[in-house]
């Protein structure tokens, strides 16, 4: 048992020895590897220090190489413009021909692009080349401008606007095929204008050329309409009737100018771009609008000298021009300010005319040298009322003017009146009715004063004023618009005050006659010392018997005086000129006053005459018939 155990230990011991031997070899190998690593690290550091400068030099060389490539490319780009000059110069100097316009425009674009490249480098060495290119571009631009004038000039023969207006035809414009040629020419001129020195408005000679050619075409075509507008005024020099709406040529002139602008705008939109469109329209139409403004100023001068009859033309001009300015701005976005500036003097005249219309009405009434002795009305009434009826046809412009003035401020042209604070939310219809009412009251008050000065009798004054009121009332009733504006209770009451005063003035002439029929002093002398009972039958015999001889004589004198006064007033009444309505109204008023008084007086005292007619010329029936005959 001992021997096998020793053998096992011996084998294990041998294996341990082998392991120790291997471990020793591993240690030696590890030391060798460590030594190799140290040597390798040392060698790596040596290599690193050797290669570092080489790598840096390589990077520098790469940067230098890239810079050289860029310089070469820049040189190539610098050579290209010079090549373009050589390539395009011949085409440009030869000028545009009918069959080579696209090539010519392409040559201009090439030179323009080359010039832009040269100027972008900012090199002093390029200054000579830039100068040469600029000169060449200027030559080409000049030739294009000549061509533009030529092509635009082919379509500027003046036209007759009335032909197109009366037949409702569109106004002619530049043909589409011509626009297709002109548009790129203008674009080339605009591009070249950046580099080529030029004069003119809008930043481009193309705009000025277009305006210089097309502007006179519009002005010349519309010239006859301007003359016609002024000639229609000359025919009104001796006409004292109010201006009739639409009879002046300014409306047709405005329509024509509007259509010219629209036609021009359609062409401009296709030729120019951006802000150049608005500038082109303004420059092109400026001369035509200036002539239009001049015409309006001349019309305004005439209006100011004939305000009472021709202020309506001012209102019409305001209505027309204001509407045109907004319509044109809506379609083109331009020209509104030019139209409103042209309108300014007329608008000021229109404001002034409202106060002047009141003053002129008053002055004309006060200046009447004499009135018809038969009480007939003055023609001034018809003239003023026709003017007011005409005024209702201009509600839109008047609403603007009255609102800007403020309620009542039309009564004075003074600065203090014009500066009165305005109602922030005025009713234009109310303002209009107040103004019309002011004119009517001014007329009636002035004629009342004049009637008191020129008519010696109350009867003549009353008839005259009643006739005046009748004409005013008739004019109001005949005009639906005038009736609408003066239909408020306040307006009716204010106007009716004059009717009542006129009637009262006429009845004053009959007061003396009616006084003969008043016998208050005799009623106290009845028997028994008491007043007679009112109502019931009157016993004339008893009353007459109760009178003393003196009282009877006084009553007889009253009958005689009444008869004479009544006959005189009846004759005068029939001799007066009265409007149909006036004669009827005044007769009824007289009858309402005299008939009951006479009936009472006759019933009481007719027995004095005993039916002989010596004192009682009229019985109740004959007096009533006589009064009825006054109508």
UniProtKB/Swiss-Prot annotation:
GO terms for cellular component: cellular bud neck; exocyst. Coiled coil: none annotated. Keywords: Exocytosis, Protein transport, Transport. It holds the Pfam family Exo70_N. One of its GO terms (molecular function) is phosphatidylinositol-4,5-bisphosphate binding. It is found in: Bud; Bud neck. The keyword Protein transport applies. One of its GO terms (biological process) is protein transport. Transmembrane segments: none annotated. InterPro entries: Cullin_repeat-like_dom_sf, Exo70, Exo70_C. Involved in the secretory pathway as part of the exocyst complex which tethers secretory vesicles to the sites of exocytosis. Also plays a role in the assembly of the exocyst. Belongs to the EXO70 family. This is Exocyst complex protein exo70. It comes from Emericella nidulans (strain FGSC A4 / ATCC 38163 / CBS 112.46 / NRRL 194 / M139). The lineage of its organism: Eukaryota, Fungi, Dikarya, Ascomycota, Pezizomycotina.
